[in-house]
Amino acid sequence: MVIKLYGSAMSTARVLVTLLEKELPYEHILVDISKGDQNKEEYLKLQPFGKVPVLDDNGFIMYESRAICRYLARKYDSGTKLIPDVDDHEAYGRFEQGCSIEYSYFAAAAETLGTELVIKKYKGLGEPDMTRVAQAEADFDKVFFEYDKILAKQKYLTGDEISLVDLFHLPNASALKAFGYQGTFEKYPNVNRWFSGLQARETWIKATAEAR
């Protein structure tokens, strides 16, 4: 059976790019958040928290985008190798460390900026908290400062081969570039080279076109 991916817009982009890198056939099923599809009883049977995306792999149901990507990378040998072998302890340790940094430091800062500067305005939730914005901008800059040192020595964040750690950054970092933070990327030449390369990958171009 073909893998089914439930979601809407950019919520599915992280999983889509992983499916495309792994060269896996899939069916993309729209969940229209604007119409409240995520709160319907049928969908809540798949994702009890009412969030997107959800993966159905021949009856095996998973949610949370990063967990889905890890599952796909571990299960399927096709396409790009995106996760190290668990018996390569140092490589796997670097991989898990990179995943944790992306989620705890980078995504946390990026999502705070998105909430304060975009979502609040869109949903009519008042003015942005500029104290939170300033702290998130400082945190974002710190991550790129450290990344630039790493990327001066290697092509990707965990070595010279691409991994999920790199792909995990694509949705939030692309949004930051689009919403006025291009200068932060350009401030760090190794980061800018790395991320420009990620955005130019055919799989990401296809994923973003499909996720719109």
From Swiss-Prot:
PROSITE patterns, alphabetized: GST_CTER, GST_NTER
Domain of life of the organism encoding this protein: Eukaryota
Residues that bind glutathione: 51-52, 64-65
UniProt GO molecular function: glutathione binding; glutathione transferase activity
Gene Ontology CC terms, in alphabetical order: cytoplasm
Domain GST N-terminal positions: 1-80
InterPro entries per UniProt: Glutathione-S-Trfase_C-like, Glutathione-S-Trfase_C_sf, Glutathione_S-Trfase, Glutathione_S-Trfase_N, GST_C, Thioredoxin-like_sf
A biological process from GO: glutathione metabolic process
Use in biotechnology or industry: Hypothemycin is an antifungal agent that exhibits excellent activity against Peronophythora litchii, which could be helpful for the storage of harvest litchi fruit. Hypothemycin is a strong inhibitor of a subset of MAP kinases such as human ERK2. It can therefore be used as an anti-cancer drug thanks to its inhibitory activity of Ras-mediated cellular signals. It can also inhibit Trypanosoma brucei kinase TbCLK1 which is a good candidate as a therapeutic target for African trypanosomiasis. Finally, hypothemycin also has inhibitor activity of T cell activation.
Catalytic activity, as annotated: RX + glutathione = an S-substituted glutathione + a halide anion + H(+)
Enzyme Commission numbers on file: 2.5.1.18
Transmembrane segments: none
GST C-terminal domain mapped to chain residues: 88-212
UniProt keyword list: Transferase
Pathway the protein acts in: Secondary metabolite biosynthesis
Family of this protein: Belongs to the GST superfamily.
Function: Glutathione S-transferase; part of the gene cluster that mediates the biosynthesis of hypothemycin, a resorcylic acid lactone (RAL) that irreversibly inhibits a subset of protein kinases with a conserved cysteine in the ATP binding site such as human ERK2. The first step is performed by both PKSs hmp3 and hmp8 and leads to the production of 7',8'-dehydrozearalenol (DHZ). The highly reducing PKS hpm8 synthesizes the reduced hexaketide (7S,11S,2E,8E)-7,11-dihydroxy-dodeca-2,8-dienoate, which is transferred downstream to the non-reducing PKS hpm3.
Protein name: Glutathione S-transferase hmp2
